[in-house]
């Protein structure tokens, strides 16, 4: 598999062939990783005023956070105002909606990123360019692009706009974020949502609602307006950490048989790669 783009929804016949993630109609992102995606608080949301809001995304009612002028969905996915404005409409469902044209994603890296995180970005870009059909290309004068910005000097989180929105988009990375979590955030950029929000997740996962922090349960809601490609993949780089948003240190997500699992922030699984390549054939 070489570099070629893809993003969002595909036909059920293709989905049956592909191993993979959860893709969802429209474009929005989220990312998590607090020293291993430990989402005890929303990415960089603990010290800033935030407002819980209700909205519509592809015809589905959702809960999101308004903070610093950004709309955070599922913790680390940033929705544009336009996406929310259009949200009451029926799901787009089209394969080209929110997909980067030709699978080409132009990017820049903020000057204050630092060499360590810059190297992590390079490693993550190499993973995408060598294993998926997307092409991450250094920007010259392109008007539609992504900028990697430096988030916090003490955290290990990140966030990103989801899918192709046009104009300048952002991927924010904290100082101690891992390469795997950079890949996770970039996954939102290409159009991937979180694996635990798939429509079929209850066949494979048991959400431990009693262990979730007060006011954070909405981050575990199923996003039924999305399109799932391939079988559920608990090892996906887009899965939440088992203790995400835990209020007591106990798991908030277990397997359906009530056993724990080890989450992946090492890199792509075969299912992740197949899903992205289904989006960007």
Question: Predicted segment positions?
Answer:
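Bacterial Sec-dependent N-terminal signal peptides
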Residues: 1-8, 15-16, 20-54
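Zinc-dependent metalloendopeptidases
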Residues: 33-281
